[in-house]
Amino acid sequence: MPQQSPTPTLRERRKLATRADLVESTLQIVREDGAEAVSVERIARESGMARATLYAHFPDGRDAIVRAAYAELGEQLVTNTEAGIDAAKDWRAQLLAVADAMIELAAQPHLGYFYNVAGPALIPDGEGRGGGSGASIRIITEVLQEAMAAGQVASGTDAVATATLLVGSLRSVGIAVASDAGAAPAMRAAFVRLCAGLRS
C-alpha cells in the first residue's frame, strides 16, 4: 500500500499560499503590461507584500519569480489540455484539443507572448522550462498509441517521434499566434490537415 504524503502544516500552507499570490501578481503584471514590466518593486506593490517577503520566497528575486510564473503558465496549459482531451470524442478531436489549448494561451495579449517568445529567451533552462512541451508529448503519445491499438492510426507509426514532431509544430503555432492572433484560424486548420495524414 503506497504511503500517503504527510499533511502540510499550517505554516507550510501559508508559505505555499504566499508563493502562489506572488506568482499570480507577477502573471497579472504580464497580462497588463508584458514581461518587461515585471520588477521586484511592482510585484511587491501589486501583491501588497514587502520586498523582504518576496526575497524570502524567491531569493534570486525577479529572475526566480519570472521562472515560477512561466512554470505556472505551463501547468495551466497542461490542465486545460487535459480537460479538452477528456471532452473530446475521438483521437482527432483529442489532438485538436492539444492545439486549441496552445492557441488559446498564445492568443492572450502579453501572456501568450511571454509563454511562447519572451519566456523561453529569458529562461534557457531550469524551473518550468519545457514542462508544457514534455507533458504535451506524453499526452499525444498516449492518444496515438490508443488510436493505433483501435486501428484508427496507421500501424507502424512511431508514437513518440510523431508526438515530438507535432509538439514542435505547436511551438511554432504558439509563436505565430502570439505575434499575430489573426493567424490562429489558419494555423488551426493546418494542424487539422497535418493530423489527418495519420489515419490508417
Residue locations for each model-derived region?
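Conserved hydrophobic residue
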Residues: 153-154
